[in-house]
Regions:
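Hydrophobic helical membrane-anchoring modules
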Residues: 1-16, 183, 188-340
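Cell-envelope/extracellular polymer assembly enzymes that use nucleotide-activated donors
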Residues: 20-22, 49, 191
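Short, well-formed alpha-helical segments that are part of the catalytic scaffolds
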Residues: 29-43
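Donor nucleotide-sugar binding loop of glycosyltransferases
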Residues: 30-33, 57, 80, 106
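A conserved acidic beta->alpha catalytic loop
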Residues: 54-62
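Acceptor/aglycone-binding surface of glycosyltransferases and processive sugar-polymer synthases
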Residues: 76-90, 107-186, 190, 211-228, ...
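The conserved acidic donor/metal-binding loop of glycosyltransferases
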Residues: 100-105
């Protein structure tokens, strides 16, 4: 099968003239809300190309999206992560905007987020949700879990994050084309955040409005199910992205148990020249060997990680930063003068 990466039409006028800007809207049964999202994006950014990825909806999501002026595509594999992977592979643009199709995010902030990306230039702009006091869209359980995961990611990866589970983001081409997109479901936001933190990609946060879903639409989030999946992903990412710390912690645990079991045996041996409880002595020795082996594995994987990070960084640097059209024109003119 031949897969083609589709280029987005360039914007003809306004502050983003000459740029290819694509909005990606993952949807599952969002016929009530998706039209509002598309209209809001088109009003905020004149000339933006909106792609709605229908994730096996059983309602009229695709029909409503097409009527609102979006390009509709279907991703048969269930899960937001599968949709994002497909969209990032399908679309070739200068700037990518990702927003959920449930109309809870402030689509009117799209222009500001894109301007912020270009002003850095940054490669990742995170829309931080500012909850409407009158709204209940941001459930208490989700808010608490989000704060916990934010602190956990900040502690593990060394960079503070305010809203790592936000579904409203803007990316540069080089962010998107260097992102592996391994997640299948809602943990994709965590993977996006860790990718930016791990490669030390220039990023910034922008506050955006967050409100209730339109009447008649239903949330697809499952607080405990999604929370456990995200926690499992963080553990997996810690294992693969911080192997020395992970396996050192594992080794330290086994070493502590080994010492706790072995010291009484050693004290008895020094007094009696006999080894009591031989099975315990064998267990303590085995745990000590596991501790040493864990440390060795961590050191080896840390070397492998360094090579992976170098390869990922080189893939990221393959693409130039996205710049405002005026700045790009000035740089091209300067380059032309130098060449002459």
């Amino acid at each position: 099968m031949l897969l083609l990466c589709v280029s987005v039409s360039k914007i003809q006028g306004g502050p983003f003239a000459g740029l290819e800007v694509a909005a990606i809207v993952p949807c599952y049964n969002e016929e009530v809300a998706v039209g509002e999202v598309i209209e809001g994006l088109k009003a905020a950014v004149d000339g933006i190309t909106v792609y709605v990825y229908d994730n096996n909806s059983t309602d009229r999501t695709a029909e409503v999206a097409a009527q609102a002026g979006a390009i509709v595509r279907t991703e048969p594999r269930k899960g937001k992560g599968n949709v994002v992977r497909r969209a990032f592979g399908d679309i070739d643009a200068d700037v990518y905007l990702m927003i959920d199709g449930d109309a809870t995010y402030e689509a009117a902030a799209a222009g500001l987020m894109i301007e912020t990306l270009l002003s850095g230039p940054y490669d990742h702009v995170l829309g931080v949700r500012t909850d409407d006091p009158e709204a209940s869209a941001y459930r208490a359980g989700h808010a608490l879990g989000n704060r916990m995961f934010n602190k956990l990611i900040g502690r593990l990866f060394g960079e503070p994050v305010t809203d790592m589970l936000s579904g409203y983001r803007v990316f540069s081409r080089r962010f998107v084309k260097s992102f592996p997109a391994l997640s299948r479901e809602f943990e994709i936001e965590t993977e996006l955040t860790v990718h930016a933190v791990n490669l030390r990609i220039p990023q910034v946060e922008v506050p955006v409005g967050f409100k209730d879903r339109p009447a008649g639409s239903e949330s697809k989030l499952r607080t405990y199910h999604d929370g456990f999946r995200i926690l499992r992903l963080i553990t997996s990412l810690l294992q693969y992205e911080r192997p020395l710390a992970f396996f050192s912690a594992v080794g330290a645990f086994f070493a502590a148990v080994s010492v706790a079991l072995g010291i009484p045996l050693l004290v008895t041996y020094l007094h009696t020249n006999e080894v009591p409880r031989l099975p315990t002595a064998v267990l303590a020795t085995g745990l000590a060997l596991i501790a040493i082996l864990s440390l060795v594995v961590g050191l080896i994987l840390n070397g492998v990680l360094r090579q992976r990070q170098e390869a990922a960084r080189l893939a990221y640097l393959t693409y130039p930063p996205v710049l405002p059209p005026a700045q790009t024109a000035l740089e091209l003119a300067a380059l032309d003068r130098v060449q002459r």
